[in-house]
């Protein structure tokens, strides 16, 4: 086995997620190829994601038979955020398709099968700078949420137990977006809760 192939094989045994956990043994997934959302106005969507957030528009499609459009934006690391525009798309419903409030401001429940929000990863050293940049662009941004393992799962202050910092805002169609910055590696102790069934019962992890 040559050096390149050997290195690739070694890397395939470890996840590149924080902490070097074992990788997926079934499928060697490389992350998100793209997430596809639906917008009301593609021109407005391009203006927001490309001109305001700086995401390059990398692919555009006109769908056949007047069905609409499908555009792709580069969000880094080879991943894309994509949007459909359908001429006769149904109107969004708060609390069903989109969260009614920003996190920390009210109810963020959305329907089963919905995409509650999209979080973009940023370096922790740029987190505060980027929050101010969004504000300077006229975007309403939530207070910073320092996620930890406390009873409320959020702290007003950054401390060693915080694992990710978050800020939330919306795109022109009300889609909930987040800039998130990991602040520490995740380990076995971070997986300590049994998943809930449909009735709310917690079951043991296998």
Regions found by a protein language model. Name each.
Residues 2, 42-43, 99-172, 195-206:
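Vicinal oxygen chelate
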Residues 2-43, 118, 122, 182-185, ...:
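N-terminal beta-strand motif that seeds the catalytic metal site of vicinal oxygen chelate
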Residues 31, 69, 77-79, 114-116, ...:
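Residues that flank catalytic or metal-binding motifs in active/ligand-binding sites
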Residues 38-91:
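Core segments of cupin and vicinal oxygen chelate
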Residues 63-64, 147-149, 183:
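Conserved beta-strand edge residues that scaffold enzyme active sites
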Residues 92-97, 188-192:
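A short, polar/proline- and glycine-enriched secondary-structure boundary/capping micro-motif
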Residues 175:
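Conserved Rossmann-like nucleotide-cofactor binding loop
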């Amino acid at each position: 086995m040559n050096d390149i192939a050997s290195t690739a094989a070694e890397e395939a045994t470890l996840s590149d997620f924080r902490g070097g956990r074992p990788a997926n043994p079934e499928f060697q997934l490389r992350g998100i190829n793209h997430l596809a959302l639906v917008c009301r106005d593609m021109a407005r969507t391009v203006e927001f994601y490309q001109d305001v957030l700086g995401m390059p528009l990398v692919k555009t499609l006109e769908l056949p038979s007047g069905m609409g459009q499908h555009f792709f934006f580069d969000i880094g690391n080879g991943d894309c955020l994509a949007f459909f525009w359908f001429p006769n798309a149904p109107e969004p419903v708060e609390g069903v398709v989109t969260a009614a409030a920003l996190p920390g401001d009210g109810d963020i429940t959305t329907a089963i099968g919905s995409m509650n929000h999209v979080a973009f990863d940023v370096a922790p050293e740029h987190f505060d700078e980027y929050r101010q940049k969004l504000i300077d662009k006229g975007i309403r941004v939530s207070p910073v949420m320092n996620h930890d393992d406390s009873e409320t799962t959020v702290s007003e202050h950054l401390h060693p137990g915080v694992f990710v910092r978050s800020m939330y805002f919306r795109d022109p169609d009300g889609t909930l977006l987040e800039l998130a910055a990991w602040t520490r590696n995740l380990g076995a102790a971070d997986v300590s809760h049994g998943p809930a069934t449909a009735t709310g019962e917690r079951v043991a992890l296998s």
